[in-house]
Amino acid sequence: FINVAGLAIGLAVCMLISLWVFDELGYDRFHQNYRRVFRVYWDESSTEPGSASALTPPPLAAAPKKDFPEVLRSTRFGTWQKRLVSVGDTNITETKYMHADPDFLTMFSFPFVKGDPASALSNPYSVVLTEATAEKYFGREDPMGKTLNVDHAFDVVVTGVLRNVPAGSSLEFDLLSPFEILLKEYIGEKNRDNWGFNSFSTFVMLPEAGAGPGLGRKLADYIKAIEPQETDTLALQPLSAIHLRSRLSHDYNNRGDIKYVWIFGALAVFSVKTAALRKIS
C-alpha cells in the first residue's frame, strides 16, 4: 500500500510540475503569427559586454516598415505613467493603460468580442477595453461608442472590446489606445523623430520566421547610416523567446527563466522514476 501511495504521489507531483512547465513553454504561442513576430532591441555590448535594452525610440517602428519590404507590419507598445480614467462618478487609476499603433491588433491575436481589429485603433482618440475593464466602467451596458475621460484632459471613444488578456502573455494591458495619444498629450511632438528617446517596445512582423537574421543585419547597418556616432546596434528577438530566454534590461515584469523550466522538468522525471523504483522494489 505504501509503495502504491508513493507512486501516486510521484505521479501527482509530476503532473503538477508538467502543467507549470507547459504553461511556461506556451507563453505568447497563442498568437497566430508568433513565429513571425520579433521585438527590436538595442544591443549595447560594444559599450558594456553582454548588455542589451528592450526600450527603443518612437521613430523606429515606422523606419523598418518604410525602408524594408520584408517588414509587413510594425508597432510601438508602451505607456508613460498611470492614468486616471473617469466615466460619470467613477474615477479609477489605471496602471495597465497601454498604447500601440494600429498594426498591433492584427499582428497579435488578442480575440475581439466587439469591434474590428483592423480599424479599432485608427481613430487617434479611441480605446479598446478588455471584458473585465468594460464591465468595470459600464456594467452590462454595451460600451461601444461610449466615452471615457483620461486625466481630466481628453476623452477617448470605445471602439473595441477584447477577451481578457491571457495569463500566458508577455504583453499585458487593460486599456489600449493609439500611440498618437502619447505623442500629442504626454511626450510631445518633439519626440516623434527623437532617436535618443528610448522608452518603448518595438515589434515587427515578417513573412516568415527565417527572415529575422537577415533583417537584423540590415537594421544594424541602418542605424549606423542615420546615427554615425552611435556605438550600439539594433537586433531582433523572437516573440517566443521573450518570456523565458530574454536577458534585456527594462523588460516586462512577468518574465520567466528557461533554467527553472529545465530544473523543474528534471525534478518531475526524477519524482516519477523514484516512485516507480520504490513500487517495483
Q: What positions do the PLM features span?
A:
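Hydrophobic alpha-helical transmembrane segments of multipass integral membrane proteins
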Residues: 7, 11-14, 269-276
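Intracellular coupling helices
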Residues: 1-2, 6, 275-281
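Sec-dependent signal peptide cleavage junction
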Residues: 25-39, 45-55, 61-63, 164, ...
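N-terminal signal-anchor/signal peptide hydrophobic helix marking the start
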Residues: 1-12, 262
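N-terminal membrane-entry
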Residues: 251-269
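Mid-to-C-terminal secondary-structure elements
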Residues: 98-114, 126-256
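Short amphipathic beta-strand/extended segments in non-transmembrane regions
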Residues: 38-42, 57-113, 226, 232-233, ...
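Alpha-helical transmembrane segments
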Residues: 9-38, 281
